Design a protein with these regions (language model features):
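Membrane-interfacial, low-structure loops and terminal tails that flank and connect transmembrane helices
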Residues: 79-101, 305-344
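Membrane-interfacial loop-to-transmembrane alpha-helix junctions, especially the N-terminal start
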Residues: 24-39, 104-105, 221-226, 342-349
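Transmembrane alpha-helical segments
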Residues: 11-18, 45, 205-213, 292-304
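Glycine-rich phosphate/pyrophosphate-binding loop
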Residues: 276-283, 292, 296-306, 310, ...
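Membrane-embedded, hydrophobic transmembrane alpha-helices
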Residues: 1-99
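Alpha-helical transmembrane segments at the extracellular/periplasmic loop-to-helix junctions
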Residues: 1-14, 102-112, 140-143, 282-298
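Active-site lumenal/periplasmic loops and adjacent helix-entry segments of GT-C-fold
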Residues: 99, 112-292
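Membrane-interface alpha helices of multi-pass inner-membrane proteins
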Residues: 51, 277-282, 323-363
Length: 363
């Protein structure tokens, strides 16, 4: 588990450095969560290319980790270091002076982490009798994911083929399993790698969805409710649950620890799938894909709302605009001649100008 946490922390800091290219007014928590997603994607892409060329070995994975940390050179720029320091100071200021609102917010995030940990802890566990899962929905998916992971670590399955069907293309989004395989190759156990990855990506999804909802609605309460609706969604299975509880004559905890039926997918054919049990547990690639999509959607929303605000601004006098354009052209020619010798400044300027394009390429 320690190996996984160290690797994920390094990738998170690397991804955090990239967040300053496309996000200006976000909190440290948001940047850490976005960084864990972006850093994982970069590591997965680099590791995939390197494994296809040189094989999935320990040196290959280590070099992939080092290459994934290259975005940290962005902090060589004083402006980026200043932004990081400002974000850190703002985070420290928010933690000072505990009040009911801050305690409630901390309890919200802490409770979600505990729930995710307890839930994903049952995704896979090993005993002397073999490998088991705590959910019947995962009986088919867990062997599939294990097959994918071990096909990378033990079978050198590059370019990837479907581990279930020989000589067929691997059309399933395998990036999450490739990340797990990378952690396993560096010494982690499969269970620890899956658990750490699932919990951190799941929490990142919660934070990113909360912020995205707030951006759209402008309501912080809606932002807090949206992740709860996602995680604890479902149908009317709770009606059958309480019906059996009141008819059973047992106390609540005795009943909850000895459930007579599965109330998400019932034996009578009624299927009320929950996002946790039927999506994030079984189709674990969603834990990587959904938060990455939210990052892109939030940026799109910001771009569209900014364009709308620009349309509402007062119109510029045409003569003034022509004069400003001429001045801008002269300035651009002057700037190009004076910056030709400074390739680092040019590269930094390109990254700043094209940060949205770079974000879309990562997506």
């Amino acid at each position: 588990m320690l190996i996984c946490l160290i690797l994920i922390s390094l990738l998170t800091v690397s991804g955090l450095s990239l967040s300053y290219l496309f996000a200006e007014d976000e909190s440290l928590l948001w940047r850490l969560c976005a960084g864990s997603v972006v850093g994982s994607v970069i590591f997965g892409l680099v590791c995939f290319v390197a494994a296809c060329l040189f094989g999935f070995t320990v040196p290959t994975v280590l070099i992939s980790v080092l290459l994934s940390l290259l975005p940290l050179i962005l902090f060589a720029r004083p402006s980026n270091r200043a932004n990081l320091l400002a974000t850190w100071e703002k985070a420290k200021a928010n933690l000072q002076g505990a009040d009911f609102k801050k305690i409630l917010s901390f309890a919200y995030y802490f409770a979600i982490v505990v729930v995710l940990w307890l839930f994903f802890d049952r995704a896979m566990f090993e005993t002397k009798d073999g490998i088991f899962t705590g959910s019947s929905h995962n009986l088919g998916d867990l062997p599939f994911h294990l097959g994918a992971i071990y096909s990378f670590t033990d079978g050198q399955n590059f370019p990837p083929e479907n581990p279930s069907y020989a000589f067929s293309k691997f059309t399933y989004p395998f990036m999450a399993d490739l990340l797990t395989a990378g952690f396993v190759r560096l010494g982690s156990s499969v269970r620890d790698a899956m658990l750490a990855q699932n919990v951190i990506l799941g929490f990142s999804l919660v934070v990113l969805l909360e912020r995205f909802t707030f951006k759209i609605t402008g309501n912080r309460l809606a932002g807090k409710i949206a992740p709860l609706l996602l995680l604890f969604s479902g149908g009317l299975g709770f009606v059958l649950f309480f019906k059996d509880f009141f008819q059973g004559g047992k106390d609540f905890f005795q009943f909850i620890y000895n459930l007579p039926a599965d109330y998400t997918i019932h034996d009578n054919g009624i299927r009320w799938g929950n996002a946790l049990t039927t999506l994030f547990l079984t189709q674990r690639s969603l834990l990587l894909g959904m938060p990455l999509t939210l990052i892109v959607l939030q940026k799109l929303w910001e771009l569209f709302t900014a364009e709308k605000n620009r349309k509402n601004e007062p119109q510029i006098n045409p003569d003034e605009h022509r004069e400003n354009t001429q001045h801008s052209a002269l300035f651009r020619r002057f700037a190009c001649r004076n910056s030709a010798a400074d390739s680092r400044s040019q590269l930094g300027g390109f990254i700043c100008r094209e940060r949205v394009f770079i974000l879309f390429q990562i997506g």
